[in-house]
Amino acid sequence: MAASPARPAVLALTGLALLLLLCWGPGGISGNKLKLMLQKREAPVPTKTKVAVDENKAKEFLGSLKRQKRQLWDRTRPEVQQWYQQFLYMGFDEAKFEDDITYWLNRDRNGHEYYGDYYQRHYDEDSAIGPRSPYGFRHGASVNYDDY
């Protein structure tokens, strides 16, 4: 089918009409849209928020709160009393008991202590697969250097 000579002219006019509609449509006359989007908008000055209690009363209330000093362990618990009696029976004094209690309570909190459990995991260092994490500890030598 041969194209009629009017068809390209109709397509050109339709394209021109679409272009004009896009340019003169809503917001098209008011200027550059990108410039308008990037332009700062005028915002009203924020008003001071209303609070139920005035500042002096709030500070007075918060200043009166006192936190009790927390014990390392609860001496009222029967198992702690039993540990204490066992330590005294074995010949340790209270200072030694407190040292040991703080050691065992803090042992899991810092996992990076050199002579703690972190480095002293004994794998066969010549095994084919090695430990699961290659960055966790040294392996591959025939000697476990952490034992020296």
From Swiss-Prot:
The keyword Cell membrane applies. InterPro entries: Augurin (IPR028173). The keyword Cytoplasm applies. GO terms for biological process: anaphase-promoting complex-dependent catabolic process; cellular senescence; central nervous system development; G1 to G0 transition; regulation of cell population proliferation. Expressed in the brain, with expression in the epithelial cell layer of the choroid plexus (at protein level). Residues 32-68, 133-148 form a propeptide. Belongs to the augurin family. This is Augurin.
